[in-house]
Amino acid sequence: MTWQTYLKDHQSRFVDELLDFVRIPSVSAKDEHFDDVVRAGHWVVERLTQAGIENVRLMETETHPVVYGDWLHAGSDKPTVLIYGHFDVQPAEPFELWESPPFEPVVIDDTVRGRGASDDKGGMLIPILAAEALLATEGKLPVNVKFFFEGQEEIGSPTLAPFIAENAKLLQADMIFSADGGQWDENQPNMIIGLKGLVGCEITVSGAKGDQHSGMQGGGIANPIPCAFTYHCLDERAGWENHG
């Protein structure tokens, strides 16, 4: 049996597993779902182990946990690839706008619909399935592989940097493949050359406290919102020419 045949023959099981994974409301932004994020991490541990990955473990950080596993038998002459993904998801509110409950996933037109089905539970599950298929049919992987999945990506990975620094040797690799992204079609991936971080801010503007009479004011009255936009466009560092 080839790995392609293996994937095809087990497709229905893989879909059921993704549905089971998406049912876990692992919303990292909400304290009430902390245990759910941990539960999702344990789900990943079990799934990696089932796939034949070794040294699999849930590792604590100062906030949400990470999951690590590896298969390092390709040989010292082969590169080591670290595969990254995340098992936490965004909040699903407002729930009333969903056609079906976000944590009760359904399959419609061959598409799994539920919170996190794409970002990133479906994405991170694919390399696990690929490794399982290769190990089941060929008994080996073409390269050494490390898996590193986190549970805090959707909140900006606030405690991931110190964890990585403390575990630099464990996570050392020749290249990193992110399973948190997209590709153009089944056979054509895309390459992302940069990612933006998160910015949170609060802007307070003030203007007239009530309606103004043109006869009393004798001219135009500045509206702070369009004025701010105009000033922004005049800024050569972030002006209109840089925004289309």
PLM features: what roles do these ranges have?
Residues K78-F149:
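Active-site metal-coordination/substrate-binding segment of hydrolases
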Residues N190-S206:
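Flexible glycine/proline-rich, aromatic-decorated loop/lid segments
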Residues W184, I193, S214-G244:
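Acidic-enriched catalytic cores of C-N bond-cleaving enzymes acting on peptides and small amides
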Residues S12, R23, T49-Q50, A136-G139, ...:
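Generic secondary-structure signature for well-ordered alpha-helical cores
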Residues M1-F95:
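N-terminal helical capping/dimerization or prosegment-like subdomains
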Residues V112-G114, K209-G215:
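Short small-residue beta-strand/loop micro-motif enriched in glycine and branched aliphatics
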